[in-house]
Amino acid sequence: MTTQGRAVGYCVVAALQDPRKDVLAIRNLFPDRIAMRLDEPEQVDMVLGDGARDRGAACELISPDPAVGAGVAFVRLEADPDPVRVRAGWVTDADIRALADACIPDRVEWPEVAA
């Protein structure tokens, strides 16, 4: 399912917070992998595959400061063993409020309806 799912229009997404060795048995079932900030260098290879840390995926060096490290990850695709550093857009709560305020239409006064 994880390797052929795209052909029929579905995908399997799995997430974990503790990349210990007990997940190694299923890790290879997922052809594409994403690793965000990790605690230890050894965890990088546990998530992205053997040698990923040596090929540049320094996930333990991603900053815990949201202004610097939010959304930063390393991606390893099935077709390429070399991890790529990516960053998803980071939207603050203030940004969301400003967008919502900008999209709210002007209030319309509705006439009273007799009951």
Q: Model-found features: residue ranges?
A:
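Conserved ATP-driven motor cores of ASCE-family P-loop NTPases powering translocation/secretion/packaging/pilus
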Residues: V8, A14-P105, P111
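Conserved catalytic/switch belt of AAA+ P-loop NTPases
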Residues: M1-A7
